């Protein structure tokens, strides 16, 4: 375009005329020559300009290429510099947080006030999923290098500012469960988690997704991983004591035990009846349970068989007698065909016979060769008879050994029937009976005469055995309150009965105070010394048909015990004059 525009300008007539007139003044050459030279110069100049332009264009093209190359390099470098930002933007776009968690359904409860107000729900929605209570879920860990946390949703709440929170009951992975002495608890299965009663509150947005957790008892086989994928729980982790317990242990608190039972039942409903472990596995498991429980449960020591020690130390006095039984008592039991065949039971029978022998009557004409002869300590037994024999002489009806053997055998049979399964309790009961029958003559007499049945004696407390009386009999023998109190002639202000007695005399302050109590209605009140200075003490009940005798008795204060008798009587008379109502007799 430039080139064509220049040729057009040179070929115009106006351009030709102007340079001619100017050249005439400077050159003397002819117009034709000058015109030819000028055209030639212009042509050369135009070609030179054209070549320069072409060269400039080539240079510009080269420069443009270099600039483009440099620009491309700069662009690449700029792209390299801007790539991290672009990647971060892309990551941010990929990690764009979903909508906040929101409750589902109506609220079920509201707790707290003010800033601490919480609204409770049964469900919440987050990231397109709905989560309910009692559902195990995976939670985002604090550190990305950690595995997701596992918890059961126990509560769903919404704070006053609208934030959703969940209360989770946590599971512990074996590498997270610390031991008290250091280190972590180990597991033989990578699926295993440890259940705990530790709870904590976290934002609802930390929930990743649901998961499956199976609670398998210790005596059941684990479900196959292929058929039932998910976590398994066989033990409970104590976050305080840093110990592990079995799911099947029954030492938890009632509420915690019910919680575990419900979780195990849910698992059994899903998996069905799992097969039991083999016997070897069960033995190993029981050993582990015993080792773990030694630290917190009282060790149950098996009862010691005392028979071995006692039977070994005691020798039979005769070749045919039982171990630990004297020849006399063995012969008596053999005569009455009362031997049981059990050495220990026969020994207990012999001791019971010996315990009641001191109240039995042994005829004087008994010969040394009789089966029921008295042993070497006969003189001692006779002395005991004299000491314990009652005044009415009823001991003579307890002939030895006829009156003793049937009752003693019945008592031992009743003890063995009720305590045969527990040798320790049976042995203790026999020792208690032998001791009390020896030291309480009333108990022995009531056993032999049939007043107390063997079953009744077995159920008597140590105090009752010592007294020889049951609780009902002891209550009947206790005197009434009226028998223990001094009855007065004062009339009760509540029931208007003349059954008021003096319960107590209280010494306090300036004078004595007397506590009066009505036997009929139980009403109690206090009276001053002046009011009760002269009281009527009711004597023993008279015979039927005779009038009651009233005796006036002057009650003196404990402070006046040291005063002369005349002075004390004078004081009481003056008090009676001042208070005539107190000295009145009932009509």
UniProtKB/Swiss-Prot annotation:
Residues 344-493 form the TFIIS central domain. It comes from the Eukaryota. GO terms for biological process: DNA-templated transcription; negative regulation of gene expression, epigenetic; negative regulation of transcription elongation by RNA polymerase II; regulation of photoperiodism, flowering. InterPro entries: BAH_dom, BAH_sf, TFIIS_cen_dom, TFIIS_cen_dom_sf. Expressed ubiquitously. Residues 66-98 have a biased composition (Acidic residues). The keyword Transcription regulation applies. Residues 560-570 have a biased composition (Basic and acidic residues). Its main location: nucleus. Disruption phenotype: The mutant aipp3-1 exhibits multiple developmental defects, such as a dwarfed size, early flowering, small leaves and poor fertility. Accelerated flowering time under long-day conditions. Abnormally up-regulated expression of many genes localized at H3K27me3 and low-methylated H3K4 enriched loci associated with a higher accumulation of activated RNA polymerase II phosphorylated at 'Ser-5' (Ser5P-Pol II). No impact on vernalization. Enhanced accumulation of intronic heterochromatin (HC)-containing genes functional full-length transcripts (e.g. IBM1, At3g05410 and RPP7). One of its GO terms (cellular component) is nucleus. Residues 1-118, 371-396, 539-587 are annotated as: Disordered. Keywords: Nucleus, Repressor, Transcription, Transcription regulation. Residues 571-581 have a biased composition (Polar residues). Transcriptional repressor. Together with PHD finger-containing proteins (e.g. PHD1, PAIPP2/PHD2, AIPP2/PHD3, PHD4, PHD5 and PHD6), cooperates to form a BAH-PHD bivalent histone reader complex able to read histone H3 lysine 27 trimethylation (H3K27me3) and low-methylated H3K4 histone marks in order to regulate transcription, especially to prevent early flowering; H3K27me3 reader of this complex. The BAH domain (129-248) recognizes specifically histone H3 lysine 27 trimethylation (H3K27me3) hallmarks, binding affinity being proportional to H3K27 methylation level. This is ASI1-immunoprecipitated protein 3. It comes from Arabidopsis thaliana. The gene is AIPP3.
